[in-house]
């Protein structure tokens, strides 16, 4: 099929993947209202077109967390990425490194910290959950640092797992899940051979390294669910801040007061995120949450955002809302599932091209030129939708 956008990669991924995997990455929590709003609220932000501004050459480069990047984009941590392509985390990390942007490895990745970092020429980022098993957390931090990783992304919006109804219907969970997944794999032979057969082992590399035993998909759900810690507070994280000597970014902030708490805690940055609409349905989209957070803490830390970003236009919109950079989640996984490393590299080229067009037509020569003045304040469409 013809690929010209991230939506094309989504369709290609849908065709290639067994349903339990496609719907796991594609779905959200409960009725998926926040999942939809993440995309819709960004698209409702009208870019302010300017002409005859002598833009000339557009420069996408920027510096985030003292790292020089080709553009203000990174790849977000996504669990089980290695199930979407053969050794998927490695392929995605190689694509990101080739394009001069960071890749963030999930705690619950298929490929281990050591495997991924050894296959790329620059340090990746590592994401860690707040878990009851402090021994695992300490082990993961020590291994990440020893591997050369210096940027830690600490996810705080998962004290309990979100309810994702699609998973029960797709076969990721629910009655006879293992049998349903097996049947789906048989009906998708290209995936079954490339990933199912040639992409082994399919355990969770970081968890298995700590537990000293293979952690299967079935084990993953139980182990992770039993280890979430809803009792944790900022004071419980102080040992991590003391242990980790590199940049530390808090992921999962939607409220300005939580952003101020992150500043007081000593975080180097935050990620304005609702976990891609996969945790609490009905919360603000990242696009709507960003302006108030930027007003509260802009200049005191690095502001990143994820959730709902599908195009270079969305990147520019989120930067105009106050973000310093963004992370792509679903968009890169769709491309990875469809075409591996080459798909991710092509997606990033598409994103960069779309950014250049948007910046040229809004009169921005450099990332620093993007501001709230790059948007037309439009309220009619969001209000009209709310009234329906």
Curated annotation (Swiss-Prot):
Q: Does the keyword Membrane apply?
A: yes
How would you classify this enzyme at the top EC level? oxidoreductase
Gene name, Swiss-Prot/TrEMBL: lldD
InterPro entries for the chain: Aldolase_TIM, Alpha-hydoxy_acid_DH_FMN, FMN-dep_DH, FMN_HAD, FMN_hydac_DH_AS, LldD
- Location(s), subcellular: Cell inner membrane
Q: This chain belongs to which protein, by name? A: L-lactate dehydrogenase
> What biological processes does GO assign it?
aerobic respiration; lactate metabolic process
Q: Which domain of life is it from?
A: Bacteria
**FMN hydroxy acid dehydrogenase domain segment(s):** 1-380
Protein EC:
1.1.-.-
Family assignment?
Belongs to the FMN-dependent alpha-hydroxy acid dehydrogenase family.
Catalytic machinery residues:
275
Q: Which cofactor does it need?
A: FMN
What is a single cellular component term in the Gene Ontology annotation? plasma membrane
Positions binding FMN in this chain are 106, 127, 155, 251, 306-330
Has the keyword ATP-binding been applied to this entry?
no
Q: Which organism is it from?
A: Xanthobacter autotrophicus (strain ATCC BAA-1158 / Py2)
List the Gene3D superfamilies hit by this protein, alphabetically.
Answer: Aldolase class I
Q: Which residues bind substrate?
A: 24, 129, 164, 278
UniProt GO MF annotations: FMN binding; L-lactate dehydrogenase activity
Q: What does the function comment of this entry state? A: Catalyzes the conversion of L-lactate to pyruvate. Is coupled to the respiratory chain.
The family database entries (SUPFAM superfamilies) matched by this protein are listed as:
FMN-linked oxidoreductases (SSF51395)
